């Protein structure tokens, strides 16, 4: 009788993988040689057996172990990387192939194989190549198979143990059903669990990025006539984008309203306030409150006080100045992602702040054309099922047209500067300055637009000690406020040019069926066109990324999401994002803190545990969702111990974490009472919701004092508090309607000298968690003391507990002040109302008005 297989859990798998790596890498002594004696013979025999089973060259492994290729940093990194990968594959295979499908011998064989490639510094390339090949075969990719790399010592797709290779090959290569495509995509995404690269690899990636940005010559194979065609196509694309946007009411005037970013600047790190901290210097001089204006509402007038008047703020053009240096300084910083380093640049605070005002205008330009509206909202299945499918088929009637899912390598670094400047010049031809003047060739805004994209002086070091390393001569900088919109336009223009050449006629953007989001693109074209598309995007500097481009008749991919196109509509195809299983990783090798993970803005998709858990289980069936949630909760147990004793599953608006519920649970009455309290419309509940909104997203409103001042003005004027459906709020936001108080922007511009409550460090994180605990305890005490105002004495014992279903579902509406109400109820809250550009522009006497006053004069 065979011995019973030992049950494995992720912790046991991780420890076993680490033990194998340490065992192999620990064979050498400090001189880099094998220990002498019989032990050496035993080890060599063991290495020989490992190589035989894994089909690895024994000589290369023994040579790597004996010739001192190992360093302490490499061993430490390899141990962490291999253990993460093995546990990730274990989780995915156990879910798709069934429990106990992975044996302990499989874990050991995989760890040995990965150690061999890690010693030779090829593990990252090996994992990406093998798993990308599996996904391509599962999606029935029609492009020719790539050539085998010289360092690959086994067959394609065989990156697991011998037994698991057979199972995975059967599912992903031979059978290739939708569930098998999901398995292949899940295996490919396991790379997201990789830790940050070691320091020597980071330096190599920084040097590669610098080489790309400082090259002078044209890339080999660039055809000058084609380049001129692409420049004309970029200008034509901008013209059509502007035409579509102006038809929808786009305001081509550069915005005056822009609040400084708190991201790092060249002069100031994020720990010191970033761009905002550089623009608004600390001023400890005692000040009296400054009268910003008088607010009138239904005959009631109340003063609005701030902390600095408009004449004192430095966020004005007069203080910022209009001189643009010939070459802007920028400091580069590595952002660590799985298997790669993304180089982000931090530019000068003044010029980048002004560029952000242009950025808002460009976002509005892109959102009015269907090809480029994805940066403003998430992908919907109708975008692919209707737009891409039908438009692509209409262009090439009578031909079979597959879906082309494109992605590029180092797109911003490699983008041809001539194409970037063509886009910039044409966009500037259509824009108006903040004082309604066209941007002529010597306009400061046009000069600024040019210089925030090209011609930077690149520095290394920190904000106090910088060393110039090179001058930018190619590409764009990832970190420039304007690089992403320009990249979208170039990507769209080049691909549309290819489609026109393929179908032999002029194609409008609406007819093209192209979806673009930065360096991601999805479109349809015949197989005969793929080589020409590859050539054109390469001329533009957009080199297709190996393993991330797919050409399939049934499946497509956009923004790392898969869709099955075999039915009448696009069907979302879920797969496991292994990094989300561990709760602390959404994208890249981030360094999120506990407060950001537990509490965040509930109106937008962010990086909290609730958002990540929903992204993890999205699209799966109930059984799979429950298994994934169990694994998720087990992995984040340490983080949950740091936060107040809040409900895990109650909606964040009612004081919980908002984790998705996949099985029945029993809710604590204490949590249900708090949910009932926060759902009430009383004054204390209003203030509690206001503070909860602030603590969820402290940087979004900048300072809690601004929220409390708005609350004070609303109460003084008795502005009604209304329940507005979320759908209506989203419609208003999409239409560009600001439902906030008219004086909110003036308050924000007055508040920067107050500083931020929570610095971006460990101390600020602990302070924010402490405030959350105090806030939650205070709300709990108030909820316990609250009494009903009607009924008999026995019935007025306190709030009724909210039903568990309603507590989990959350509110269907938002409480906001109705600044625009007419006689306690205006038509702005009617769902059939069509929003105007400014819904508050009515001349009726009972409309709210903000009367501006100067520092030395009274109200007008």
From Swiss-Prot:
Keywords: Nucleotide-binding, Nucleotidyltransferase, RNA-directed RNA polymerase, Transferase, Viral RNA replication. It catalyses: RNA(n) + a ribonucleoside 5'-triphosphate = RNA(n+1) + diphosphate. Residues 839-860 are annotated as: Disordered. Its EC number is 2.7.7.48. Disulfide bonds: none annotated. GO terms for molecular function: nucleotide binding; RNA-directed RNA polymerase activity. It is an enzyme of class 2 (transferase). InterPro entries: DNA/RNA_pol_sf. Residues 846-860 have a biased composition (Basic and acidic residues). RNA-dependent RNA polymerase which replicates the viral genome. Belongs to the ssRNA positive-strand viruses RNA-directed RNA polymerase family. This is RNA-dependent RNA polymerase.
């Amino acid at each position: 009788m065979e011995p019973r297989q030992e049950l494995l859990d992720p912790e046991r798998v991780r420890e076993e993988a680490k033990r194998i790596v340490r065992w192999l890498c620990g064979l050498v002594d400090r001189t880099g040689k094998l220990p002498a004696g019989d032990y050496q013979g035993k080890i060599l025999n063991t290495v020989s057996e490992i190589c035989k089973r894994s089909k690895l060259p024994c000589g290369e492994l023994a040579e790597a172990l004996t010739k001192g290729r190992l360093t302490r940093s490499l061993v430490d990194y390899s141990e962490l990387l291999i253990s993460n990968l093995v546990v990730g594959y274990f989780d995915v295979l156990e879910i798709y192939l069934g429990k106990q499908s992975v044996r302990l011998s499989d874990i050991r064989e995989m760890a040995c194989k990965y150690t061999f490639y890690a010693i030779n510094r090829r593990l990252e390339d090996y994992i990406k190549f093998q798993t990308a090949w599996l996904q391509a075969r599962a999606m029935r990719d029609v492009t020719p198979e790539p050539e085998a790399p010289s360092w690959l010592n086994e067959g394609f797709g065989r990156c697991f143990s011998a037994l698991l290779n057979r199972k995975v090959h059967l599912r992903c290569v031979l059978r290739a059903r939708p569930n098998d495509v999901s398995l292949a995509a899940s295996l490919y995404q396991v790379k997201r669990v990789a830790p940050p690269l070691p320091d020597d690899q980071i330096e190599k990636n920084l040097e590669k990025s610098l080489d790309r940005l400082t090259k002078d010559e044209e890339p080999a194979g660039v055809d000058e006539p084609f380049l001129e065609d692409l420049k004309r196509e970029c200008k034509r694309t901008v013209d059509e984008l502007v035409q579509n946007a102006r038809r929808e009411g786009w305001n081509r005037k550069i915005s005056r309203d822009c609040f400084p970013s708190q991201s790092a600047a060249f002069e100031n790190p994020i720990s010191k306030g970033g761009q905002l901290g550089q623009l608004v210097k600390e001023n400890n001089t005692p000040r009296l409150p400054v009268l910003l204006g008088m607010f009138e509402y239904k005959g009631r007038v109340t003063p609005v006080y701030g902390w600095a008047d408009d004449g004192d703020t430095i966020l004005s053009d007069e203080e910022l100045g209009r001189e643009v240096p010939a070459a802007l300084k920028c400091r580069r910083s590595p952002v660590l992602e799985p298997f790669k380093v993304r180089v982000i640049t931090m530019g000068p605070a003044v010029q980048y702040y002004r560029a952000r005002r242009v950025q808002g205008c460009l976002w509005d330009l892109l959102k009015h054309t269907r090809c480029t509206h994805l940066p403003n909202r998430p992908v919907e299945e109708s975008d692919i099922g209707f737009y891409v499918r039908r438009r692509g088929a209409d262009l090439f009637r009578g031909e079979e047209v597959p879906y082309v899912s494109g992605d590029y390598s180092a797109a911003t670094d490699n983008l041809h500067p001539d194409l970037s400047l063509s886009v910039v010049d044409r966009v500037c031809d259509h824009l108006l300055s903040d004082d309604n003047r066209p941007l002529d060739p010597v306009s400061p805004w046009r000069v600024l637009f040019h210089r925030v994209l090209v011609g930077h002086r690149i520095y290394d070091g920190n904000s106090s000690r910088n060393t110039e390393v090179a001058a930018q001569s190619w590409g764009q900088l990832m970190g420039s406020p304007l690089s992403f919109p320009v990249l979208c336009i170039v990507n769209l223009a080049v691909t549309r040019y290819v489609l026109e050449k393929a179908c032999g006629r002029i194609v409008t953007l609406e007819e093209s069926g192209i979806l673009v989001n930065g360096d991601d693109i999805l479109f349809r074209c015949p197989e005969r066109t793929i080589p020409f598309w590859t050539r054109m995007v390469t001329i533009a500097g957009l080199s297709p990324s190996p393993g991330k481009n797919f050409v399939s008749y049934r499946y497509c991919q956009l923004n790392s999401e898969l869709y099955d196109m075999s039915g009448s509509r696009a069907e979302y195809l879920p797969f496991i994002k292994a990094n989300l299983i561990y709760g602390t990783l959404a994208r890249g090798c981030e360094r999120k803190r506990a407060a950001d993970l537990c509490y965040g803005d509930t109106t937008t998709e962010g990086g909290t545990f609730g958002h990540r858990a929903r992204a993890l289980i999205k699209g799966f069936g109930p059984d799979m969702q429950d298994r994934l949630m169990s694994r998720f909760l087990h992995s984040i147990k340490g983080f949950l111990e740091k936060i107040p004793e809040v409900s895990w599953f109650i909606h964040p608006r009612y004081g919980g974490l908002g984790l998705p519920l996949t099985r029945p649970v029993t809710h604590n009455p204490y949590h249900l009472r708090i949910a009932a309290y926060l759902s009430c419309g009383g004054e204390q509940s209003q203030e509690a919701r206001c503070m909860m909104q602030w603590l969820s997203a402290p940087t979004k409103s900048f300072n809690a004092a601004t929220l409390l001042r708005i609350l004070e003005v609303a109460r003084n004027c008795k502005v009604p508090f209304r329940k507005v459906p979320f759908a209506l709020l989203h419609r208003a936001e999409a239409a560009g309607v600001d439902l906030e108080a008219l004086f909110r922007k003036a308050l924000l511009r007055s508040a920067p000298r107050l500083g931020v409550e929570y610095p971006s460090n460990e101390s600020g994180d602990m302070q924010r968690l402490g405030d959350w605990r105090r806030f939650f305890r205070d709300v709990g005490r108030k909820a316990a003391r609250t009494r009903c105002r009607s009924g008999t004495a026995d019935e007025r014992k306190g709030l009724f507990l909210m039903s568990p279903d309603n507590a989990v579902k959350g509110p269907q509406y938002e409480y906001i002040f109705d600044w625009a109400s007419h006689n306690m109820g205006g038509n702005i809250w009617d769902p059939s109302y069509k929003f105007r550009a400014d819904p508050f522009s009515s001349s009726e006497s009972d409309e709210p008005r903000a009367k501006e006053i100067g520092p030395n004069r009274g109200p007008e």
